[in-house]
Regions:
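Dinucleotide-binding Rossmann-like beta1-alpha1 core, especially the glycine-rich loop
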Residues: 53-137
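Glycine-rich FAD pyrophosphate-binding loop
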Residues: 29-50
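A conserved short coil-to-beta-strand element within the FAD-binding core of flavoproteins
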Residues: 179-193
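Beta1/beta-strand and adjacent pyrophosphate-binding region of the FAD-binding site
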Residues: 6-18
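C-terminal catalytic lobe of FAD-dependent flavoproteins
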Residues: 153, 159-161, 169, 228, ...
Length: 501
C-alpha cells in the first residue's frame, strides 16, 4: 500500500532516531515546526544505547585543550540534572593515583579547572584528594599499592531512555515519529525534498519537507553519498567503543576512573544494582555499523586494566554482557582514535533555489545533545523563522519529581504492593509517568513475565514508547535483559505475538 502524496510539507524531515535526531525533533516541534523523524530500526538501536551512560564534562578532554567542549558539557550536565531528575543521577568518581602516568600536580590542576568550569552545585560536590584505605569503600577492593587518589563528581544516565523520553516529548508536541521505517529514496525539485519512506510492515509513503536533517549517526556519510555529495570526503571518522558488564566487584555506589599506560582512561561504573560496567575502548572502525561487535582484543584490554588495579581478578567467565557502539566523529585528522574530538560539527548546504536545505551532523556526545539540537535550530533559523530556544528549562516526560528516592517512597505509599526495589526502578525509568500503568492491586498489573516485568508495563511500552520486540523492551526500555532467561524471554515474545497490533 503506497501513498504518493501527503498533505502539507513538513518543515523538517529528520533521518535518524538516535539522541541527536530526537533531540532536534523535540526542540523543533516545541518551536511550532511540523516535524517527522524516520528511524530504520528502533529508537536508540545503535550508538545512542551503546554509550558509557555518563553525563559528564569529559575530564580527559582537558588534556586535548577542548575547553569549550568541557565548559559546554559541564553546563549541560547541570541542565540535564534539572530537566531529567529521574534519569540523570549524581555519581562520584575515584581516580587512583599512578604517579608514573600523570603526576599529582597535573591531576590537581585538571580537577581544579573541572570544578571551576562548572556551575557550583550542592548535588555535585567538588573534587578532593583522598586516602585509599583498606577499611573504606574507595580503597577496599584495590591492590594495596594504591594508597592515594582523587575523587570528583559527574553523572550517570540511562542513555536509551533519554532518547525515548525526548521522542515522547517531541510526539506530544506534534512530531511524527516513525520507527522501523527506511528512507529508500530522496529527491528534490530545488525547493522541497521528496522522501520515500518504506515501513517494515510493507506500507510506503512519499513525504515532502522543506529541510532535511541528516542525523543518521554512523550512516551520515551514506546519506550524503546517496545525495551525491562526494565532498563529504574524510569528514567522518568511525570509532568503535566497547563495554563489558560483570557482577559488581567492589563495595560502594561510586565509580572508578582508571589510567592506562597508553594514556587512555577506562571507567568502572555501578550498573543495574548488582553489576558493574567497564569501558570504553577507542578503535578505528571501517566495517558495517550494523554489525559492530566487541573483539577479543578489546575484552583482553579491559580485563587487563581492571586486573592491574583490583585485588579480585576478573576473566571472560565473569562477563554477563557486552556491547559495542560506533561513534560518528568529525575527522579532525588526529592520529589516535582516542584523541579525536567529541565535539559536534554541522554541515549546512542548500536553500539557494538549486537545492533545499540540508543539515548533516557529525560528532557530538550524549551529554551535549540538547545544546546540539538548540544550536542546530539556531543554524536553521534563517530558513524556519523560529529562533527562540526553550528546552533548557522544560522537564522531560516524567521529570516532575524531586528525586527518584523520594518519589519511590511516594509510590510505595500509594501502591502498597510495591517492593522498594521495584518502586525505585519505576521512579528512575519513568518518574511520575509510572502512575499511568500502575494499579492499586498487583492482580490488575497482569502477567509477571519475570523480575517484576508486568503486562501493564509492557502494554505501556508498546502503546506509548514505540516498543515492538523483546529486545526493545528488555534491552532499550527496561534493561532487564541482563536478568531474563530464555524461557522468560520466550514467554514475553509469545505475549507480543498474540497481542493485537
Amino acid at each position: 500500500m503506497a501513498s504518493e502524496h501527503v498533505s502539507a510539507p513538513y518543515d523538517l524531515c529528520i533521518i535518524g532516531g538516535g539522541i541527536n535526531g530526537v533531540g532536534i525533533a523535540r526542540d523543533a516541534a516545541g518551536r511550532g515546526l511540523r516535524v517527522l523523524v524516520c528511524e530504520q530500526n528502533d529508537l536508540a538501536s545503535a550508538t545512542s544505547s551503546a554509550s558509557s551512560k555518563l553525563i559528564h564534562g569529559g575530564l580527559r578532554y582537558l588534556e586535548h585543550y577542548e575547553f569549550r567542549l568541557v565548559r559546554e558539557a559541564l553546563s549541560e550536565r547541570e541542565t540535564l540534572l534539572n530537566i531529567a531528575p529521574h534519569l540523570v543521577q549524581p555519581l562520584r568518581f575515584v581516580l587512583p593515583h599512578e604517579p608514573h602516568l600523570r603526576p599529582a600536580w597535573m591531576i590537581r590542576c585538571g580537577l581544579f579547572l573541572y570544578d571551576h568550569l562548572a556551575k557550583r552545585s550542592d548535588r555535585l560536590p567538588g573534587s578532593q584528594a583522598i586516602k585509599l584505605e583498606r577499611d573504606n569503600n574507595y580503597g577496599q577492593a584495590l591492590k594495596p599499592q594504591f594508597t592515594k587518589g582523587f575523587i570528583y563528581s559527574d553523572c550517570q544516565v540511562d542513555d536509551s531512555r533519554l532518547v525515548i523520553l525526548n521522542a515522547m516529548s517531541a510526539s506530544q508536541l506534534g512530531a511524527t515519529i516513525l520507527t522501523r521505517s527506511r528512507c529508500s529514496e530522496i529527491n528534490h525539485d530545488g525547493k522541497l525534498w521528496s522522501v520515500r519512506i518504506e515501513q517494515a510492515s510493507g506500507a510506503s509513503q512519499v513525504i515532502q519537507a522543506k529541510i532535511l536533517v541528516n542525523a543518521a549517526g554512523p550512516w551520515v556519510a551514506q546519506i550524503e553519498d546517496y545525495l551525491h555529495k562526494p565532498e563529504h570526503g574524510n569528514k567522518l571518522r568511525l570509532v568503535k567503543g566497547s563495554h563489558i558488564v560483570v557482577p559488581k566487584f567492589y563495595p560502594g555506589d561510586h565509580a572508578y576512573i582508571l589510567q592506562n599506560k597508553d594514556n587512555r582512561i577506562v571507567f568502572a561504573t555501578p550498573y543495574r544494582d548488582n553489576f558493574a560496567m567497564i569501558g570504553t575502548t577507542d578503535v578505528d572502525y571501517t566495517g558495517d555499523p550494523a554489525q559492530v561487535a566487541i573483539s577479543d582484543e578489546e575484552i583482553d584490554y579491559l580485563l587487563s586494566l581492571i586486573n592491574a588495579y583490583f585485588d579480585q581478578p576478573l576473566s571472560r567467565a565473569d562477563m554477563v554482557s557486552s556491547w559495542s557502539g560506533v561513534r560518528p566523529l568529525y575527522n579532525d585528522n588526529t592520529g589516535t582514535a582516542s584523541a579525536v574530538t567529541r565535539d559536534y560539527v554541522f554541515d549546512l548546504s542548500g536553500g539557494n533555489g538549486q537545492q533545499p536545505v540540508l543539515l548533516s551532523i557529525y560528532g557530538g556526545k550524549i551529554t551535549t545533545y540538547r545544546r546540539l539540537a538548540e544550536h542546530a535550530l539556531e543554524k536553521l533559523a534563517p530558513f524556519t523563522g523560529k529562533s527562540k530556544g526553550w528546552t533548557s528549562t522544560q522537564r522531560l516526560p516524567g521529570g516532575a519529581i524531586d528525586s527518584p528516592d523520594a518519589y519511590a517512597q511516594q509510590l510505595i505509599q500509594q501502591y502498597g504492593w510495591l517492593s522498594p526495589a521495584l518502586a525505585l526502578r519505576y521512579a528512575k525509568a519513568y518518574g511520575n509517568l509510572a502512575n499511568a500503568f500502575l494499579s492499586a492491586n498487583i492482580e490488575e498489573m497482569g502477567t509477571n513475565f519475570g523480575h517484576d516485568l508486568y503486562a501493564s508495563e509492557v502494554n505501556w511500552l508498546i502503546e506509548q514508547e514505540w516498543a515492538q520486540t523483546t529486545d526493545d523492551i528488555l534491552w532499550r526500555r527496561t534493561r532487564l535483559g541482563l536478568l531474563f532467561d530464555t524461557q522468560q524471554t520466550e514467554q514475553l515474545a509469545h505475549y507480543l505475538d498474540k497481542r493485537p497490533h
